[in-house]
Design a protein with these regions (language model features):
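Non-cytosolic coordination micro-motifs
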Residues: 17-165
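Charge-dense, intrinsically disordered terminal/linker segments
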Residues: 1-16, 38
């Protein structure tokens, strides 16, 4: 029985070939994942429902991953979220509320000092993470975070560190 369970776990955790993208349910996520593969090469990890690039292979992001999902999101304009980008950013406790008010697509992991942006492309994610950095640096007043975030996204204010192929 133990051998059966070990083999089953090995099967479940086995990495898949990039062709697994063809079976994805959400066309927008599938199309964007394929676009990233074209620009940045094969991902480091491929599963049935996710592709992942890590170790700054895409710009300054610690990791970028696309999940076979399409989450409707209306702020600041209607779109769907499926790509996640993570950076090491330490968000002080007193700025957590300002970050939360700025966007529902900003995910803060205080234990790992990481912030993940989820949107429809890595450009919007770079803008979002750059916004969080500016907020922490004091360049944006916490009480203005929601309005400032919309401005950053709508005006395409990419941070200096963002380099796209």
């Amino acid at each position: 029985m133990k051998l059966i369970i070990e083999n089953w776990n090995r099967f479940l955790n086995e990495e898949k070939d990039i062709s697994s993208l063809d079976s994805w349910e959400h066309e927008d996520a599938k199309s964007y994942a394929k676009e990233l593969v074209e620009k940045y090469g094969d991902p480091d990890v491929v599963t049935d429902n996710m592709v992942l690039w890590k170790d700054n292979r895409i710009s300054e992001f610690k990791k970028v991953y696309v999940i076979d999902e399409s989450i409707p999101h209306d702020s600041p304009a209607p779109h769907h979220d499926y790509v996640y980008s993570t950076m090491e950013i330490d968000v002080p406790e007193d700025l957590m509320e300002a970050v939360a008010k700025a966007s529902e697509s900003i995910i803060v992991d205080q234990l790992k000092n990481e912030v993940t942006a989820r949107c429809g492309d890595i450009i919007a994610n770079a803008i979002t993470l750059g916004f969080v950095q500016k907020l922490i640096d004091g360049d944006i007043k916490p009480e203005n975070s929601e309005e400032e975030y919309k401005k950053y996204i709508l005006e395409g204010m990419t941070p200096d560190w963002f380099k796209e192929k």
